[in-house]
Design a protein with these regions (language model features):
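Short beta-strand/loop motif that positions the catalytic acidic residue
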Residues: 156, 162-164
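Conserved alpha/beta-hydrolase "acid-adjacent" motif
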Residues: 169-174
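Serine-hydrolase catalytic machinery in alpha/beta-hydrolase-like enzymes
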Residues: 11-103, 199-202, 206
């Protein structure tokens, strides 16, 4: 991999007895990397997350979209809401990035959707507890931050943006509950007229605009510690 070519490759990460499938995109001379944590019933093929990822790539940010569950696991509804498992799988993806010499030095952000947002917040909080600020920023799209532990919400230091559709009223309330507990730099952005999947005209474009702006602002650190996450 060189700094002057666009890299797109499929990857597999071995975690315990599972293999996680992922898609890596690295633009020339990236300003940072963003790891996507998909929500329940979604995957690396999510058209919404891929749309956001493409906008990030256009702005010089590398992306890794990865399935946190295998196909068999995803059929089990209870596993979809196993936040601890999702967090451990997300940690394995971070470890993979930190061991990849071509991208390990770039600032790292997390983009979470639905239950994936809870896993992203818990992982970011882990870094704080481990005295390691390796997560530079977090963005949640229609996320369930309320499913993260209270300790994680109160501990996280990474600047966090919560994006919710204005018509997704129950999720707005859940985001507000989590937002109150968070002590980091934070912002709750409600997109008027948007529902949970942001399928309305212009809604996903607004999500992308907000995410690009947030990550460009905080993915500024030129190097980060190459430290594996202990389980």
């Amino acid at each position: 991999m060189t700094r002057h070519q666009l890299v797109h490759q499929s990857i597999r990460i071995h975690v315990d007895d599972a293999y996680l499938e992922g898609d890596l995109h690295v633009p020339p001379s990236p300003v940072g990397m963003v790891l996507f944590a998909h929500g329940s019933g979604s995957s690396r093929l999510s058209p919404r997350n891929n749309y956001v990822a493409a906008r990030l790539q256009e702005n010089g940010i590398g992306t890794l979209l990865i399935d946190l569950l295998t196909a068999d696991e995803d059929r089990d509804f209870s596993i979809r809401f196993d936040i601890e498992l999702l967090t451990l799988r997300l940690a394995a993806a971070v470890n993979w990035i930190r061991l990849n010499e071509d991208i390990q030095s770039h600032a790292l952000g997390l983009f979470g959707a639905s239950t994936g947002a809870a896993a992203a917040l818990q992982l970011a909080a882990f870094y704080r507890q481990g005295q390691d600020d390796g997560i530079a920023a977090v963005v949640s799209r229609g996320g369930r931050p309320d499913l993260a532990s209270q300790e994680a919400l109160q501990t996280i230091v990474a600047p966090t943006l919560l994006i919710v559709g204005g018509e997704d009223r129950s999720v707005i309330s859940l985001n507000e509950q989590a937002y109150v507990l968070m002590r980091c730099e934070k912002r709750l952005q409600i997109i008027p007229g948007a529902t949970h999947l942001f399928e309305e005209s212009g809604a996903l474009e607004k999500v992308s605009e907000l995410a690009v702006s947030w990550f460009l602002r905080y993915l500024a650190s030129p190097t980060l510690p190459n430290q594996k996450i202990a389980r």
